[in-house]
Amino acid sequence: MQHSQVSPNARQQLAETVVLNKARLGLSWQDLADGTGLALTFVTAALLGQHALPEAAARKVAAQLGLDDDAVLLLQSIPLRGSIPGGIPSDPTIYRFYEMLQVYGSTLKALVHEQFGDGIISAINFKLDIKKVEDPEGGSRAVITLDGKYLPTKPF
């Protein structure tokens, strides 16, 4: 049976332990995701407290990280989602995503509604991918794919 968290504190504390053990053991997020049958981005988000992991995946990553049975249960619990308390993020990387939505949010909304109609793009039935590609002008570029199911508004 799945259980739900009533506070983000336990998952935040576990996320801090995950990051510390990951560093101590020299593991990458990909190392932790490998063999779970789940996407790198999903496993990373789960280990940072944003998703529940299936039992087999929770046991696998807990074993890699040296976590106990309580951590395995916690990794399977449904978290209180949302990792940006207090509104505007101060971390520069997260802020850039906030800034992108400040600049392009109304454009995305207009194009979604024009192409799909009145509704939303789900963040539950959702896939996220990130790839590093070479920039022809030098350096690297990040290609981020947000793939969410369109859910139309239904009058009632």
From Swiss-Prot:
It comes from the Bacteria. The active site is at residues 96, 99, 122. Pfam families: Cyanate_lyase (PF02560), CYNS_N (PF21291). It catalyses: cyanate + hydrogencarbonate + 3 H(+) = NH4(+) + 2 CO2. GO terms for biological process: cyanate metabolic process. InterPro entries: Cyanase, Cyanate_lyase_C, Cyanate_lyase_C_sf, CYNS_N, Lambda_DNA-bd_dom_sf. GO terms for molecular function: cyanate hydratase activity; DNA binding. Its EC number is 4.2.1.104. Keywords: Lyase. HAMAP family: Cyanate_hydrat. NCBIfam families: cynS, PRK02866.1. Catalyzes the reaction of cyanate with bicarbonate to produce ammonia and carbon dioxide. Belongs to the cyanase family. This is Cyanate hydratase. It comes from Pseudomonas aeruginosa (strain ATCC 15692 / DSM 22644 / CIP 104116 / JCM 14847 / LMG 12228 / 1C / PRS 101 / PAO1).
